[in-house]
Swiss-Prot record:
Keywords, sorted A to Z: Chloroplast, Hydrolase, Plastid, RNA-binding, Transit peptide, tRNA-binding
Descriptive protein name: Peptidyl-tRNA hydrolase, chloroplastic
Entry annotation: catalytic residues: H112 (proton acceptor)
Any Pfam family: Pept_tRNA_hydro
E.C. code: 3.1.1.29
Gene Ontology terms: cellular component: chloroplast; chloroplast stroma
Species of origin: Arabidopsis thaliana
Transit peptide start and end: 1-55
Record text on subunit structure and interactions: Monomer.
């Protein structure tokens, strides 16, 4: 039997693999070697009728076939796809808060160790354990608000504080603008606080060591705690190793509470607000 060409409307149809597989060798040509082809000898009408029956019985498979007909427009199919996951927030780098002092019971409660005491007060207030020794420091991690923080008290003795601070900054890749160093200052009146964005060491050996270990950079904030000047002709080295009397300790506790609030403002609201809170506090109290 001769091959018969299909009309264009039939030739352009696409069929699933399970429909009329015996009748077709190509989309546009009808061949008749198989027995079922005898049913189509009555002409194109018979062929169209059989095709209509085939399409009707296969409508369910056609509607779900990804390679043939689709009952949904492309826009609806795209909307049905699962939405992409929301982007994760950028990684929040921690703040490092370092208190300077000397290790050991011999130096507890001395003027040179007020940096240690400030960090201890912060750890107690925020429930942060400082029992781990790491990076040559008593070390702890916690959170204030949604800001991760690290607390450190170098155990290298004051003059080598930079060994510890340098290791922590390098290991965690902490930006220097997020390294706050708390230490004693002879040039400030007792109990007064001063928050600065950067500066030199001012003759403080602990700060000198830190600046050296940070490759000479001075661009990190510091919270200075005033311990006053030595009375009379007392040697400065002896003065900074003296312990506080009871009245001084009570005043210092009040200073620490102010320092805690200043650190919270620094982390949550920024340096400028914290500096305004700290550096204008004394004058505001005097006016009230």
């Amino acid at each position: 039997m001769k091959a018969v060409a299909f009309p264009a409307k039939i030739a352009n149809l696409s069929f699933p693999s399970n429909c009329c597989s015996l009748f077709f060798r190509s989309p546009a040509t009808f061949l008749s070697p198989a027995l079922p082809c005898r049913k189509l000898t009555k002409g194109i009408r018979g062929l169209e009728g059989l095709m209509s029956q085939c399409l009707s019985s296969s409508s369910q498979s056609l509607s779900f076939s990804s390679n043939s007909f689709s009952s949904q427009p492309e826009s609806e199919l795209l909307q049905a796809l699962p939405s992409s996951k929301p982007k994760s927030p950028p990684l929040q780098l921690p703040w490092l808060i370092v208190g300077l002092g000397n290790p050991g019971k011999k130096y507890q409660g001395t003027r040179h160790n007020v940096g240690f005491e400030m960090v201890d007060a912060l750890a107690d207030a925020e429930g942060i354990s400082m029992n781990t020794v790491n990076f040559k420091a008593l070390f702890g991690k916690g959170v204030i608000g949604n800001i991760p923080i690290m607390l450190a008290k170098p155990q290298t003795f004051m003059n080598l504080s930079g060994e510890s601070v340098g290791q922590i900054v390098s290991f965690y890749k902490i930006p220097l603008k997020q390294v706050l160093v708390v230490y004693d200052d002879l040039d400030l009146p007792f109990g007064k606080l001063r928050l600065l964005p950067k500066g030199g060491h001012g003759g403080h050996n602990g700060m000198r060591s830190i600046i050296d270990r940070l490759k000479g950079s001075r661009d990190f904030p510091r919270l200075r705690i005033g311990i006053g000047r030595p009375p009379g002709k007392m040697d400065t080295a002896n003065f900074v190793l003296r312990q506080f009397n009871r009245q001084e300790q009570e005043e210092l506790d009040h200073t620490f509470q102010t320092g805690l609030e200043a650190i919270r403002i620094l982390l949550l609201e920024g340096f400028n607000k914290s500096a305004t809170f700290v550096n204008t506090r004394k004058s505001m109290e005097q006016l009230s």
